């Protein structure tokens, strides 16, 4: 169906880390050089979790008017966009060199944002109609009760 369970976010750290080449990890971590492999893995995993959290929040911001977010089941397209945005978040920590391979990450991020903008406008669907805002059962409806009018033309006559 193109949906998957959403336990933590719209993508996993493993999925995001698969998209990053090993030689990029040091530049993502930043100025501190970490020789110990376990320590390096902990650092990049923590950064990746933050990047995923930010990506999911960004996606939810675009989709909140059309869908009930966060999704309980992640549509496949949202998984892809979350990975692209999270990778961009990681790579852009130290700036994007548009003449290098980072340009690909910038292009994928821009494409993701363009797609989300179109979803927000209603021209594209993410395939999660069961979670669309306002698609719930309206059989119970709602009632509105108010007191009678206090001020009217007749009651205010002469003022």
Residue ranges and their predicted role:
Residues 1-78, 140-159:
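Conserved short "hinge" loops at termini or chain/domain junctions
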Residues 2, 88-159:
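Short loop/turn elements at secondary-structure junctions
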Residues 77-88:
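Core structural elements
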């Amino acid at each position: 169906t193109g949906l998957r369970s959403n336990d933590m976010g719209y993508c996993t750290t493993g999925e995001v880390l698969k998209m990053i080449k090993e030689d990029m990890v040091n530049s993502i971590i930043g100025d501190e050089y970490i020789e110990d492999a376990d320590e390096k893995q902990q650092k990049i995993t923590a950064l990746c979790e933050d990047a995923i959290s930010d990506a999911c929040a960004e996606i939810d911001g675009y989709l909140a008017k059309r869908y009930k977010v966060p999704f309980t089941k992640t549509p496949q397209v949202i998984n892809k966009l979350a990975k692209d945005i999270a990778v961009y978040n990681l790579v852009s920590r130290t700036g994007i060199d548009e003449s290098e391979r980072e340009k690909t990450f910038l292009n994928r991020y821009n494409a993701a944002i363009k797609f989300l903008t179109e979803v927000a406008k209603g021209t594209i669907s993410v395939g999660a109609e069961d979670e669309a805002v306002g698609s719930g059962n309206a059989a119970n409806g709602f009632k509105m009760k108010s007191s009678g009018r206090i001020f009217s033309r007749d009651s205010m006559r002469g003022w």
